Amino acid sequence: NIKWKKLDYFEPYYFFVPKDFKANEEYEKGFKIDDVFSVSNSGAKTDRDSLFIDMDKNTLEGRALRLLSGDYDEKFKQKYRVINSGSYKLSKKLKNRIFDHNFIQPIQYRLFDYRWIYYDPNLISRPGQKVFKHIVSKENLALLTCRQQSTFDFQHVFLTKILVDICTVSMQTKETGYAFPLFLYFKDGSRATNLNMEIVAEIEKIVGKVSPEDIFDYIYAVLHSPNYRN
């Protein structure tokens, strides 16, 4: 007695529920966000937020000093989980590491929630250096969004000038936050745009000469547009 319904599908979408693809042709005329920006990465993940992140800079500094000096007791070890778990071998990472004040950096932990992180890429689980080496102590902007959505209507867009956590945009497990920096920095201190210049050229054919900031602002505005979101 089951009434079957044949589903329409095409690459790269293979939904197992009915979908309305009427607007898909118009939607596909746009550019994919990870095609517009050449370099991107998920936000930083420490695996030990209570150890490496704090609201107070001085408190974090004291805790990091204690951790890296090895001058801590069993209570400290249990409270801050100074233990190995899964593939994250903290004890191994701590070997031969010394405290460096330059690793204390501001982080946008959640939306409008700014904290401090001891950002030693050799210590935390997933530092996201691919992106954050272009942001930490640099003049830059990064677009924040999620690659997939598992909850309510699309509103997963923000921006940052500093480090972000993997859950800055959303705390849902499936909604990992990604950062797309506007500029890439080189060892000599120079920088270049992180935008795909072929796509920039296509845009300039329509609107004329634009700056990287113009395109960044436009993308951010469109992603906030009610018409686009609907």
Predicted stretch roles:
Residues 1-230:
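Sequence-level detector for compositionally biased, low-complexity segments
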